[in-house]
């Protein structure tokens, strides 16, 4: 873990600049990955690789007129809220940038960020913020809760490998484990990565990305391969993936168009059910690979409960769900209302609904 990369060497609570190196005490967490500190001249410093409460040595990588950006080179005094995460890629992979921070501190930081935004940007008075901001509703799981992960291809020593975007988004970090992914499927990621690495040695798969969805409730496991249109070794890919990961569904999502505006052309079933199912809020949803669904099923249920509580829908009422997606709120509303009008422009989500 990243906590072991920077040994404790001394305690210093003041902030001073030494050439292009600075000694900083991190005051809070910002939106995104960075910790916030201030230089002696009062300029804000966004610090990569640090958490609130850390005292660090940091190298300035950008010095702007109103703020600076810096990269942690050494943790001098760790925050009492710093933890040893279960993932060895925290601080390298860009997927869990707060992984070194305790859950309690994460929740407090998110609430403080919201309060600060309402005051600074929304111009709400502190007493109004106190009334508006309620305690955070959250799930119990710190790790092992994600029902979906996505992998990006990269070339290592002339061979295609799969990984995740790094802290530097231009780089791909090759991984074969992710403690954020559903803990009921501990071998799924490694099996899929191994199978596709093997296939890439003898076939040009043209992979643009790979999606893996898992449900502990339905036991559904889907592997989605995003590729351009054209020829594809369907039988070999489906056979190797089935033997390695035993998914309930293997699909190929074909896309076309300019790189920054790719659109889904077709979803092709290679093996199994051709879709992914999840039980949620007293119902079941069936989703195709391109459709969006909250990556935290229990978190989605909390959102549904809050919305239903606020709306208090009645049997004789009509409801309109705008930007409804595949129906996360539409379906619970339909079980409570007389009629629901669902509005959505994205084709795959409309077909799923």
Language-model-derived ranges and their functions:
Residues 2-3, 12-25, 31, 232-353:
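Rossmann-like S-adenosyl-L-methionine
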Residues 9-89, 119, 169:
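Terminal RNA-binding accessory module
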Residues 53, 181, 296:
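Short, conserved phosphate/pyrophosphate- and ester-handling motifs at nucleotide-, phospho-/glycolipid
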Residues 57-59, 150, 320:
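Hydrophobic beta-strand signal
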Residues 73-85, 91-205, 217:
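Extended interfacial segments that mediate partner engagement and assembly in macromolecular machines
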Residues 147, 221, 316-317:
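Nucleotide donor/acceptor-binding cores
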Residues 217-228, 284-288:
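Short, aliphatic-rich beta-strand segments
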């Amino acid at each position: 873990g990243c906590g072991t990369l920077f040994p404790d060497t001394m305690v210093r609570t003041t902030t001073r600049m030494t050439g292009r190196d600075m000694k900083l005490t991190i005051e809070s967490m910002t939106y995104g990955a960075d910790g916030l500190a201030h230089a002696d001249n009062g300029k804000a410093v966004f610090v990569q690789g640090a958490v609130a409460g850390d005292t660090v040595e940091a190298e300035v990588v950008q010095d702007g007129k109103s703020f600076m950006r810096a990269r942690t080179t050494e943790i001098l005094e760790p925050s009492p809220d710093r933890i040893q995460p279960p993932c060895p890629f925290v601080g390298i992979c860009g997927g869990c940038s707060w992984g070194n921070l305790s859950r309690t501190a994460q929740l407090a930081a998110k609430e403080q960020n919201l309060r600060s935004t309402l005051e600074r940007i929304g111009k709400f008075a502190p007493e109004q913020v106190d009334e508006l901001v309620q305690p955070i509703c959250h799930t119990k799981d710190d790790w092992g809760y994600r029902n979906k992960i996505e992998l990006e291809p990269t070339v290592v020593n002339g061979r295609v490998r799969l990984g995740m975007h790094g802290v530097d988004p231009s780089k791909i970090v090759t991984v074969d484990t992710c403690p954020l992914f559903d803990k009921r499927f501990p071998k799924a990621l490694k099996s899929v990565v191994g199978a596709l690495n093997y296939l890439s040695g003898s076939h040009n798969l043209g992979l643009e990305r790979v999606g893996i969805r898992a449900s502990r409730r339905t036991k559904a496991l889907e592997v989605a391969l995003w590729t351009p249109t054209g020829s594809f070794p369907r039988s070999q890919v489906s056979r190797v993936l089935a033997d390695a990961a035993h998914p309930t569904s293997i699909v190929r999502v074909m896309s076309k168009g300019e790189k920054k505006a790719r659109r889904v052309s077709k979803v092709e079933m290679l093996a199994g059910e051709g879709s992914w199912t999840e039980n949620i809020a007293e119902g079941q949803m069936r989703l195709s690979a391109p459709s969006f669904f909250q990556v935290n099923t229990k978190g989605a249920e909390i959102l549904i409960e809050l919305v239903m509580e606020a709306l208090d829908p009645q049997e004789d009422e009509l409801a309109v769900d705008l930007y409804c997606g595949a129906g996360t709120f539409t379906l619970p509303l339909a079980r409570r209302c007389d009629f629901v009008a669902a509005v959505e422009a994205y084709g795959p989500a409309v077909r799923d609904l």
